[in-house]
Amino acid sequence: MTRALVLFAHPCPESFSAALHARVVGTLERRGWQVDDCDLNAENFQPVLTETERRGYHDDPANIAAVQPYVQRLRAADALVMVFPVWNFGYPAILK
């Protein structure tokens, strides 16, 4: 079965992006895709680099450990679909 990682980045469940996200997930599932639905806000993803993380920036094993579950999910996917709004000519901070 083909697997898609759907990455969603919007904090408001009533947003247009949330409706688009639901449509994407539903369409993929109806077409036989296995969907890994990753809502970064719902999963409390922390995009901010802490002092400890910055000081260990060049320590690859330590850097990888913090995001390893997300790396594994991405590597397991055959396709990546990103659903997010464009705010102030860019993507949301949680994706940076």
Language-model features, listed with the residues they occupy:
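N-terminal beta1-alpha1-beta2 submodule of the flavodoxin-like/Rossmannoid cofactor-binding fold
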Residues: 1-96
